[in-house]
């Protein structure tokens, strides 16, 4: 198993598919990485030499924010919004949808399980 950005990527899969196992790298980024380091997208990870794996690793480290650093950056952005007290920050603080979705009905994923209210029946 090749280890890139702290993630053991599967060896039997094609290189672009295997790279998507790294948080912060999607299909488009994975294809761009393969093109940047001149690796054919149809090759499998177990066919790569150590030098090619090293080239992928160095390209990702130099170009992309991935894994723990990406998670930390996202959390810091959310914390910044909450500290500012802006509308989006308030929605995060109250665990409500942030992007304008309706909440009168629906939004159960974000709000959690429905809470029973005594005397609500007609």
Swiss-Prot record:
Key words, A-Z: Ribonucleoprotein, Ribosomal protein, RNA-binding, rRNA-binding, tRNA-binding
GO molecular function: rRNA binding; structural constituent of ribosome; tRNA binding
Transmembrane portions of the chain: none
One Pfam family named in its UniProt record: Ribosomal_S13
GO cellular component, one term: cytosol
Top-level taxon: Bacteria
Region Disordered, residue ranges: 98-122
A biological-process GO annotation: translation
HAMAP family in the cross-refs: Ribosomal_uS13
Function description: Located at the top of the head of the 30S subunit, it contacts several helices of the 16S rRNA. In the 70S ribosome it contacts the 23S rRNA (bridge B1a) and protein L5 of the 50S subunit (bridge B1b), connecting the 2 subunits; these bridges are implicated in subunit movement. Contacts the tRNAs in the A and P-sites.
Family membership: Belongs to the universal ribosomal protein uS13 family.
Subunit structure, interactors included: Part of the 30S ribosomal subunit. Forms a loose heterodimer with protein S19. Forms two bridges to the 50S subunit in the 70S ribosome.
Protein name, per record: Small ribosomal subunit protein uS13
The species this protein was found in: Ruegeria sp. (strain TM1040)
Taxonomic classification: Bacteria, Pseudomonadati, Pseudomonadota, Alphaproteobacteria, Rhodobacterales
Gene behind this protein: rpsM
